[in-house]
Amino acid sequence: MIVIVGLGNPGRKYAKTRHNVGFMVVDELARKYGLVFKEKNDYYITEWRLENKDITIIKPTTYMNLSGTAVKKVVNEKILKNLPESLIVIHDDVDMPLGKIKIKKNGSSGGHKGVQSIIDSLGTKDFIRIKIGIGKNPYQDVSEYVLSPFTSEQRAKIQEKISEAVESIVVIINEGVNKAMNIYNRL
């Protein structure tokens, strides 16, 4: 069993904001493979099967800073024993250039409150992350910046990278995280 988590904030107000790039990736994954999310408890959920692997995809509705609450519920329900290889979290990264994708096996939250919430809730830093750079505006407060929408020029670039992130998920599932890191961390 694999659990994929796209991080973001629920509601129309946040739908197109930089902080919701994790939601955008799992929405694109669902669109590409004909999956439909259903609301359940503190998250939206859909199930997928790829290469004989059962996969659960969620979008927490707890708001970013409490994402760990929803993730822990799903992890406990699905009884993930091999956590590092079984949990994939997709999120934005303000410290990376716009559109840069970086896949990591584990590590700190890097200041991302949604990731920190997951670390705190699960009691481990050992899970796969797909980080997508959203850039940074030195003239704008970080919290204001991440909650603002992409410009139309940025949107075109980020859409291309969202598709790459979906491809990277498939590589992780089919060929492993090391192969995905070798491919996508170089781009």
Swiss-Prot record:
One annotated GO biological process: rescue of stalled ribosome
Reaction(s) catalysed by this chain's protein: an N-acyl-L-alpha-aminoacyl-tRNA + H2O = an N-acyl-L-amino acid + a tRNA + H(+)
Recorded GO MF terms: peptidyl-tRNA hydrolase activity; tRNA binding
Subcellular location, record wording: Cytoplasm
EC number: 3.1.1.29
Gene Ontology cellular component annotations, sorted alphabetically: cytoplasm
Membrane-spanning intervals of the chain: none
Annotated site residues (Discriminates between blocked and unblocked aminoacyl-tRNA) in this chain: N9
Site (Stabilizes the basic form of H active site to accept a proton): D92
Pfam families listed in its UniProt record: Pept_tRNA_hydro
Database matches in InterPro entries: Pept_tRNA_hydro (IPR001328), Pept_tRNA_hydro_CS (IPR018171), Pept_tRNA_hydro_sf (IPR036416)
Annotated positions binding tRNA: Y14, Y63, N65
Domain of life of the native organism: Bacteria
UniProtKB keywords: Cytoplasm, Hydrolase, RNA-binding, tRNA-binding
Primary enzyme class: hydrolase
Classification via Gene3D superfamilies: Peptidyl-tRNA hydrolase
Active-site residues, record numbering mapped to chain: H19
Purpose of the protein: Hydrolyzes ribosome-free peptidyl-tRNAs (with 1 or more amino acids incorporated), which drop off the ribosome during protein synthesis, or as a result of ribosome stalling. Catalyzes the release of premature peptidyl moieties from peptidyl-tRNA molecules trapped in stalled 50S ribosomal subunits, and thus maintains levels of free tRNAs and 50S ribosomes.
Family, as annotated: Belongs to the PTH family.
Subunit (UniProt): Monomer.
Protein name per UniProt: Peptidyl-tRNA hydrolase
Protein species of origin: Thermodesulfovibrio yellowstonii (strain ATCC 51303 / DSM 11347 / YP87)
Lineage: Bacteria, Pseudomonadati, Nitrospirota, Thermodesulfovibrionia, Thermodesulfovibrionales
Gene for this chain: pth
